[in-house]
Amino acid sequence: MWIGVDVLQAGELDRLLRRDWFRAYVYAPEELAVAAGFGEDRAREFLTGRFAGKEAALKVIGTGFGSGVTPRQIAILRSGGGAPVVRLSGRAERIAADAGMAGIHLSITHKKGMVVAAAMGVPRYVGQSFA
């Protein structure tokens, strides 16, 4: 089954999020543009959630960063209603496609200092097994 979960403490990335190189390496321009519209605390929460989402998506495709997949190849965008939408590119997209995935669904939640992201691969064909 194509399922991935990641959990972070809300402040776990604080030091890294203050570094421009980290933001540029990890986040797509669209993710940073959304975060720029928030105050400092909400931007930090938003970007931490996006990082957890990327980690959960990596687990879905069965690889990790450093295997030719970079964090920016997994962009967590927003639907018209604000829900997270996963956009894969590069090697991440090829791995998912080769596994038979049409895409990845993602949910991110923030509660009491924790961030949790749960992701699920969506099969390309109706009736296709998740195995």
Q: What do these predicted regions represent?
A:
Residues 1-131:
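Core catalytic alpha/beta fold that binds nucleotide/phospho-ligands
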